[in-house]
Amino acid sequence: MDAVQELEHRITELEIQSALQEDVIAGLNAMVAELRQTLDLQQAQLRLLYQKMQDRNPDAQEPYSLRDEIPPHY
């Protein structure tokens, strides 16, 4: 191979690597966006649960106890 062919080969290899990296980055970006949505949903659920706990007994001096949540079949 002469120098020009070697350079063309190297450029082709770099273009292939770049295309593969772009594909991986796009996949990772989609995954991060999905995880962000999941995190936002979980944070909203946690805020709702916290608000429900506060609404149940807003003036209580003692912490919330799971013993207050005995299932109805007991």
UniProtKB/Swiss-Prot annotation:
Pfam families: SlyX
Source organism superkingdom: Bacteria
HAMAP family: SlyX
Family recorded in the similarity comment: Belongs to the SlyX family.
Protein's name in the database: Protein SlyX homolog
Organism, as annotated: Neisseria meningitidis serogroup C / serotype 2a (strain ATCC 700532 / DSM 15464 / FAM18)
Gene this chain is encoded by: slyX
